[in-house]
Amino acid sequence: MSMNENHDIQLVIITGMSGAGKTVAIQSFEDLGYFCVDNLPPSLLPKFLELMKESSSKMSKVALVMDLRGREFFDRLIEALDEMAENPWITPRILFLDAKDSILVTRYKETRRSHPLAATGLPLEGIALERQLLEELKGRSQLIYDTSDMKPRDLREKIVAHFATNQGETFTVNVMSFGFKYGLPIDADLVFDVRFLPNPFYIESMRPLTGKDEEVSSYVMKWNETQKFIEKLVDLLGFMLPSYKREGKSQLVIAIGCTGGQHRSVTLAEYLADYFKKDFYTHVTHRDIEKRSRK
C-alpha cells in the first residue's frame, strides 16, 4: 500500500484579522490532538507538509496559524494554496476569523498592543490595510467565524463542536439565533426574519425569560403563523441542505432573527437544530441571549 493511501493530511489554516482570536483557536486545535504550528512562513508550507507526510509519526491532523505582515507574505500564501490544491493527499481548509472594527480596536486597547500593520500606531489604519490584504483569502475560506460577540470560551466551543467530529466529510449545520437590534451576523449563509410572529416580550411574565424556557417556547409555537412558517421553512431547508452537502460545503450557518434575540428566534433556532439533527450534525448558538434585560 502506498504512502498516499496511508497518510493523508487534514490541514486547517487559521488566519484572519489580527485580534480576532487566532491564539485561542490554535490552543483549541491542540486540545483536539492536532499538530500545531504558529506563524509558519508561507514559503515553507509545501516543504513542511512533505516532511509531515514522510514523518514516521504519521501526523494526519495539522493546524497552522498564518498571520500576514505585508503584500509579499500574502502573495506567497496564495501561491502555496494553489500548489496544495494539486496534491491529492492534502485536504486543506481555511478557517478565517473576523470581528467588527470597533471590537478589534477595543481588544487592542485592552491588551495595549499595536496593530502589526499600523505604521503610525493607530489601530484603525492597520485594520483597514489588513482587511484589504485579506479580501481574496477570505473569499477562499471554507469557514468564517465572526468573533465580535464571542468570549474565548465561545470560540473554543464552536471549534470543538465542528472539528471534533468533522474529519473532512461531515457536513455541519450551525443554527444561530440573533437580535436585529444588535446587527446581522456576518458569518451567516442564510438569514430568516421571524419578527412577524407574536412577541412574548409584551407579556410581562415572559419578558425576563428566553425561548429556551418552556413557557415562552409553547407560546411562540402555538400560533398558526408559526406552524405554517415552520412547515414551509423545513421543506425549503430539507431541499437545500443536501444540495449544499453535495457541493462539498463543510458547514452552513442558518441565522434566525427577531428583535432582541431572546424569545422568538431562540425558540425557532432550538426547533430547527433538533429537527435536522437526525440527518445532519447540528450545533445551535444564541448570539444575543445574554444581552436580555431582566427589569
Curated annotation (Swiss-Prot):
The keyword Lyase does not apply. Disulfide bonds: none annotated. It comes from Bacillus velezensis (strain DSM 23117 / BGSC 10A6 / LMG 26770 / FZB42). InterPro entries: P-loop_NTPase, RapZ-like, RapZ-like_N, RapZ_C. Keywords: ATP-binding, GTP-binding, Nucleotide-binding. HAMAP family: RapZ_like. One of its GO terms (molecular function) is GTP binding. GTP binds at D67, L68, R69, G70. This is Nucleotide-binding protein RBAM_031990. It holds the Pfam family PapZ_C. The keyword Nucleotide-binding applies. Signal peptide: none annotated. Displays ATPase and GTPase activities.
